[in-house]
Amino acid sequence: MSPQTETKASVGFKAGVKDYKLTYYTPDYETKDTDILAAFRVTPQPGVPPEEAGAAVAAESSTGTWTTVWTDGLTSLDRYKGRCYHIEPVPGEESQFIAYVAYPLDLFEEGSVTNMFTSIVGNVFGFKALRALRLEDLRIPNAYVKTFQGPPHGIQVERDKLNKYGRPLLGCTIKPKLGLSAKNYGRAVYECLRGGLDFTKDDENVNSQPFMRWRDRFLFCAEALFKAQEETGEIKGHYLNATAGTCEEMMKRAVFARELGVPIVMHDYLTGGFTANTTLAHYCRDNGLLLHIHRAMHAVIDRQKNHGMHFRVLAKALRMSGGDHIHAGTVVGKLEGEREITLGFVDLLRDDFVEKDRSRGIYFTQDWVSLPGVLPVASGGIHVWHMPALTEIFGDDSVLQFGGGTLGHPWGNAPGAVANRVALEACVQARNEGRDLAREGNEIIREASKWSPELAAACEIWKEIKFEFQAMDTL
């Protein structure tokens, strides 16, 4: 590049940033079974070669800094440095590349998602040599997986606790999410649970506000679920949100929930933080509480295609930090979620071993060793007409959560719950009989509505409701 054609970015790059590729770009490197592997979508500044950009990511997220320092001689750089070992162009994108980086396991504290993210994504995303950077996927080696407790209980233990098998679980978020008194809130919980739902839920921003303090909510919700249990003979739960301003306050709420004898609590793991989440997950395992996880704030991190972090990484991090449920999109509802990509990270949440499959956005084969699985939660803009698709897409090991799709029923909360339970049971029965839910779904719902007036009313009110927008999260 001649001086006349050099861009300002390239001049600034040469003047202020060390040439990283000599040390950190190692295309001949053979990855180790113990390495943490990362796939970054890199958009370099004009004038910055992709190899240099990838090497800069490896350096700044491991041992490197902008210049040579004398203390480099006091350690083994070869042992501790991150390495950019492969770069490939992103199809259809002129200036984007996937940079693969390998990190030695010794760079990370055992059992700490907080430390892992502080290293890999903590500083490098503000790097001037890059226009944008997105972490697409991580491969967590067996040796590191085994340092985490993971979910407090996992899918099979949860089913055994609830004595519920062979179908998805049904839930409902209480609406309006803010403004109800604790007693009215508890009444809404009771109506939904007695109507046939397995769970009701605090919304993510229900903590302890002036209109409803947490202790009052916990008491009224516990009363509601125990009353519903007595009437239905089924084990019921309400996700009591323990998220708080301090870890001490969060734990106080979790302890009170355990003393009440309820089966499950909840945490907003991104706004609450991974340290708090892991602390709560350990308490839940030790004290027999299930842990529901809400992903509030995730779209701030994962919505943009070229910058941030893909949700599949956040999902893996949650499985390591600990949670028995996590919201994972719906594919068919009001919130973001393309089918193949969503099913990719749903498998990463549930399965013990997941093969690399770029068609579903999975960059690395992931072996979870003995870490329990997490139930994906489908929630957001779904109603009875979506039940066949949800049952077919997510299968039995899932939680299908209908907020407005329960509470918006024209006859009230309990009939709304009845409608959802009837629709689910009809879909499960039809599937077990060999019927095609994708092709015959509407017919299955219509047949069931003939003997369930609650379902018929729900079908009528939501027959025209659709959320047809193009997904942002595409391959």
UniProtKB/Swiss-Prot annotation:
Main location: plastid
Alphabetized UniProt keyword annotations: Acetylation, Calvin cycle, Carbon dioxide fixation, Chloroplast, Disulfide bond, Lyase, Magnesium, Metal-binding, Methylation, Monooxygenase, Oxidoreductase, Photorespiration, Photosynthesis, Plastid
Domain of life of the native organism: Eukaryota
Site (Transition state stabilizer): K334
Chain positions found as N-acetylproline: P3
Record localization: Plastid, Chloroplast
One GO CC annotation: chloroplast
Propeptide: 1-2
Listed GO MF terms: magnesium ion binding; monooxygenase activity; ribulose-bisphosphate carboxylase activity
PROSITE patterns (UniProt xref): RUBISCO_LARGE
Active site: K175 (proton acceptor), H294 (proton acceptor)
Enzymatic reactions: 2 (2R)-3-phosphoglycerate + 2 H(+) = D-ribulose 1,5-bisphosphate + CO2 + H2O; D-ribulose 1,5-bisphosphate + O2 = 2-phosphoglycolate + (2R)-3-phosphoglycerate + 2 H(+)
Post-translational modification: The disulfide bond which can form in the large chain dimeric partners within the hexadecamer appears to be associated with oxidative stress and protein turnover.
A single BP term in Gene Ontology: reductive pentose-phosphate cycle
Record: residues binding Mg(2+): K201, D203, E204
Cofactor, free-text remark: Binds 1 Mg(2+) ion per subunit.
Residues with the N6,N6,N6-trimethyllysine modification: K14
InterPro entries named among the record's database cross-references: RuBisCO, RuBisCo_large_chain_AS, RuBisCO_lsu_C, RuBisCO_lsu_C_sf, RuBisCO_lsu_fd_N, RuBisCO_lsu_N_sf, RuBisCO_lsuI
Known role: RuBisCO catalyzes two reactions: the carboxylation of D-ribulose 1,5-bisphosphate, the primary event in carbon dioxide fixation, as well as the oxidative fragmentation of the pentose substrate in the photorespiration process. Both reactions occur simultaneously and in competition at the same active site.
Family: Belongs to the RuBisCO large chain family. Type I subfamily.
Miscellaneous comment text of the record: The basic functional RuBisCO is composed of a large chain homodimer in a 'head-to-tail' conformation. In form I RuBisCO this homodimer is arranged in a barrel-like tetramer with the small subunits forming a tetrameric 'cap' on each end of the 'barrel'.
Name assigned to this protein: Ribulose bisphosphate carboxylase large chain
Protein source organism: Lotus japonicus (Lotus corniculatus var. japonicus)
Name of encoding gene: rbcL
